[in-house]
Amino acid sequence: LRVLQVDSGREWRGGQNQARLLCRELARERGVEQVLVTKRGSELARRAAADGTTVFEVPWGWGLDPRAWFRVNLAVSEFKPDILHAHDGHALWMAHKTLGDARLVATRRVDFHVGRFSTWRRADRIIAISTAVKNVLAADGVAATEISVVPDGIDPDEIRRSAEQPLNVRGQLGLPAGTRIAVNVAALVDHKDQLTLVRAAAHARPTDPDLHWIVAGEGELRGPLTAEITRLGLTDRVHLLGYVEAADALIRESDVFVMSSKEEGLGSVILNALALGKPVVATAAGGIPEILPADALVPVGDAVGLAGKVLDALSHPPSRMPFPERFTAATMSRGVLALYRSLL
């Protein structure tokens, strides 16, 4: 079985890590050969190569870069894959324009709607990372037979190892050692909705004035978030750290992990928090309810409810939730491999 994995590698987020983990796990399977095509010099290229994956790095700028398209075609003609697996929308456009007779698989990680003439409809099979994503695709008219649900997965031991080196975020922020902190790790983009998290911080302050909120991530929402933090008088309680490479160490130092998304394919960073034994509070967006029990969830946009759940988790910490086996990288890889084989 020959598989050409394609990811634009434009950033390093959960989707790129899933592509890396899939390549790593498939390399352990007998009879599977694979090559990863991704952006030259990207974090995905670096990390996948460090895992031992064969990586074909290509120039890949913004937009539909013809240089990348040419080199994806070159990789297809040289490698002659049975399966061409696209891991994001840009990769899918490149993949569906290539020459050859490989079966086209595409992983859909977001619960956004797809248009009538979307390239996503060109795939032989779409992997939805949650039932919520599958339901959105089905509502948009994609045939159920063309969608398979394979949840994201992580390596819990890898997460724990990556969190071993202390970050000492309290010290960096000049906070006393015992200060309670609620942590969010997500890009600062509209669908992650950290504005609701900031408003939750305002609602929580009268009850727990010493609670600090830390947001790790970067993006277009930084300006509006900074303005809202200032408007609510929270500049000494809500801290925007920007991108934090040692995100797992940050999560490990938290007292509670918080997600405030209004749209979410699955929310795989929640899995990292569970692997580190942290209580999690989140909005019931997209696939998040497929990970967390109902008593850890609040409605999307409910800042008051989010504040209340965070305060409850701090005052009455829930029992440590065992890590669910269905969300391991090994389980994810087995599901994807079974799908590949079903197409041949």
Predicted features and spans:
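A charged, aromatic-enriched C-terminal amphipathic alpha-helix characteristic of glycosyltransferases
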Residues: 14, 317-344
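A conserved mid-protein helix/loop that constitutes part of the nucleotide-sugar donor-binding site
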Residues: 13-24, 180-203, 213, 220-226, ...
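A short helix/loop element that forms part of the nucleotide-sugar donor recognition site in Leloir-type
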Residues: 160-175, 230, 318-320, 324
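Carbohydrate-associated surface elements
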Residues: 132, 153
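Aromatic "clamp/platform" in nucleotide-sugar-dependent glycosyltransferases that forms part
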Residues: 243, 262
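Short hydrophobic beta-strand element within catalytic cores of glycosyltransferases
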Residues: 36-38, 279-282
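A conserved, positively charged/aromatic
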Residues: 100-131, 140
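Conserved acidic donor-binding segment of nucleotide-sugar-dependent glycosyltransferases
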Residues: 295-304, 311-316
